[in-house]
Swiss-Prot record:
The keyword Metal-binding applies. The gene is mtnB. It comes from Exiguobacterium sibiricum (strain DSM 17290 / CCUG 55495 / CIP 109462 / JCM 13490 / 255-15). This is Methylthioribulose-1-phosphate dehydratase. The keyword Lyase applies. It comes from the Bacteria.
Length: 206
């Protein structure tokens, strides 16, 4: 695909997530691979209101997260997370959002270091079709130092698709294509919301 196609794919995801209010306080960042050798990708520019569309919404960076040539804006503060994804896998897209549900889930299960899901139909959206399929999402500490956070995050990048929760921060999901990454992020957010609502209902009943 061309650079422009990748740009439009990422812009469409940004618009859709903005409509869902998944970018509170300018949080969150999105990235899509534009080249594999050498690794290059588009990533959301830092500090911008992602509910607005401007010509400078994304910047083009190299395998270390540095700007390629002169550009307006600078890469998102968490670009190093996407650097780890694109350098360690052939994934084509990496998405990071802060939602209330993923933050609450990460705090509730943070001491366990993971959350597990099974017996949910939407797990199939994650590519798991077995009758007893189980999905495990690791939960890591929210290090203020981004290189430290990225190093901890990188320990859980083992496949071309995956997800990691950062405690009281957000989730990063990556997959081979933008479509797959968006689909999987939607599935995880569904599972988080379902889990929280189910727990609340059980407490109300019992």
């Amino acid at each position: 695909m061309t650079f422009l196609t990748r740009y439009e794919e990422l812009r469409a995801i940004k618009q859709e997530f903005a409509a869902r209010d998944w970018f509170p306080g300018t949080s969150g960042n999105l990235a899509i691979r534009t080249n594999s050798s050498p690794t290059e990708f588009l990533v959301t520019a830092s500090g911008k209101d992602k509910r607005q569309d401007t010509p400078d919404d994304f910047v083009h960076v190299d395998a270390t997260g540095q700007l390629i040539g002169e550009q307006n804006g600078r890469p998102s503060a968490e670009t190093l997370l996407h650097v780890e994804v694109f350098n360690r896998t052939t994934a084509g897209c990496s998405l990071h959002v802060h939602t209330v549900d993923n933050n609450v889930i990460s705090e509730l299960y943070g001491d366990r270091g993971e959350i597990r899901f099974r017996s949910q139909e939407i797990i199939k959206a994650l590519g798991r079709w077995e009758e007893d399929a189980e999905v495990i999402v690791p939960i890591i500490t929210n290090h203020a130092d981004i290189p430290t956070l990225a190093a901890d995050f990188a320990k859980h990048i083992r496949t071309e698709s995956g997800a990691v929760l950062i405690r009281n921060h957000g989730i990063t999901v990556w997959a081979p294509t933008a479509f797959e990454a968006k689909k999987q992020l939607e599935a995880f957010e569904f599972l988080f919301s379902y889990t929280l609502k189910l727990q609340a209902c059980r407490q109300a009943i019992y």
